[in-house]
Amino acid sequence: MSLDKTYKLVPGTTVFDAEQSAKGYHLNQFCMSLMTAENRAAYLADERAYLDAWPLREEQKRALLDRDLNAAMREGGNIYFLAKWGATLGFSFQQMAGSMTGMTEEEYRAMMVGGGRPVDGNRIDHAVLEAAHADPAPPVEHAVITGAVFTSHVPAIGAAMDHAKTEEPYWRPVFEGYAFSRQWERENVPDVIFLVYNDHASAFDLSLIPTFVLGTGAAFPTADEGYGPRPVPGVEGDPDLAAHIAHSLIRDDFDLTLANELTVDHGLTVPLSLMFGDVGKWPCKVIPFHVNVVQYPVPSGARCFALGRALRRAIESYDRPLKVQVWGTGGMSHQLQGPRAGLINREWDNAFLDRLVTDPAGLAGVPHLEYVEEAGSEGIELVMWLIARGAMSDVDGTGDVEVKHRFYHVPASNTAVGHLILENHPRAEGPAEGEN
């Protein structure tokens, strides 16, 4: 089904949504640049020259030069960002708001002193609202999830590839375990990969610790993790699908952080290298999805599994015929710190792989303590696999999954390597619906 955007029907109102954000991204970032005295002085000295240094559309520049806030809003401006511009010019919020109503400043102030604008006469027309809420026809075409890939994202694996060590005796067994996977991926190239990973203190430090981060930008460069960026292609995003997913997941009560700019580290690039090899450009678009598994509390397996189910609904309600894969990365058992560093638990890992296939809902109930005790402090990354598993159609009985490949190997640096490919075979009734 299409997403509910009836907020657009409220008269005289611009709700700043993903469409507005995309349209006005550089306009609003320009406004943010005015938060330093030096930049404010430069702007006031030559407004046109300052604006020309930004990748703004001419309509956006003209709106600012003409002091036309309604035009700036139509061009994607947000009032809180535009307030920085207004403050630079000496405007108050009342002056800015009043300028958009057709009233003089004195008339607007008098209205506010008198109690403000009444809501009567400023609501949505009921007939228009009822028509908007009429049951829409399901999309003729929609995106489908074709499969899930689960894999460890060990940084040393990326280093082995980058330094031509893949044929060394230590590393050869690891890469042999992905030979089938690369062939499968060549035969099943998706349009988009929704790639679940965790950042390793590369894009996020302790000044900002979001739980779930959805990459909504057009491009994501490779992070420098202390050794220089990996020599791999940057990632091309899919802002339209990402915006749709954001709207759907947040509507389903998952609180996301949206990142229009984001560098991606080995958590994302190593899985791509393992599945696609050494390429000049990744063969599909990638939507990064970061999960905090670094600082407790981290999301539970149950929450991640529920998010995966909601993700499937989001993707299948997108009205473009895209093939989408969902990847869950990280793990398996490993501990990188403390006297227990080096912990590996083969038995637990393989039981996890078994249950991931046959009992994902039960596996989602495993508590954090078991992950840490049995799989090591960094083994908690495995909750991210449950997002990808929750997105498969067998979870709600509307399809089946097929195991195409399974691989497990120790050692790979400090970590047990696990890998699984599930093909998704939904039935043809239509997009998924339902509750979390």
Give, region by region, the residue ranges found by the protein language model:
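Acidic/polar N-terminal loop/beta-strand segments that form early-domain functional surfaces
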Residues: R48, S152-V154, L195-D199, D205-L206
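Charged, low-complexity intrinsically disordered segments
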Residues: M1-P138
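Catalytic metal-binding/acid-base residues of hydrolase active sites
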Residues: D199-A201, M332-S333
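Divalent-metal (often Zn2+) His-rich catalytic cores of metallo-beta-lactamase-fold enzymes
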Residues: G330, L336-R340
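Flexible, D/E/H-enriched segments
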Residues: A137-D191, L206-A306, S317, P339-N436
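Beta-strand elements within well-structured catalytic alpha/beta cores of enzymes
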Residues: D191-Y197, F289, L322-G330
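Hydrophobic alpha-helical segments and helix-packing faces
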Residues: Q20-L27, T36, D238, S300, ...
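Non-transmembrane, aqueous-exposed alpha-helical and coiled segments at domain scale
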Residues: R309-V324
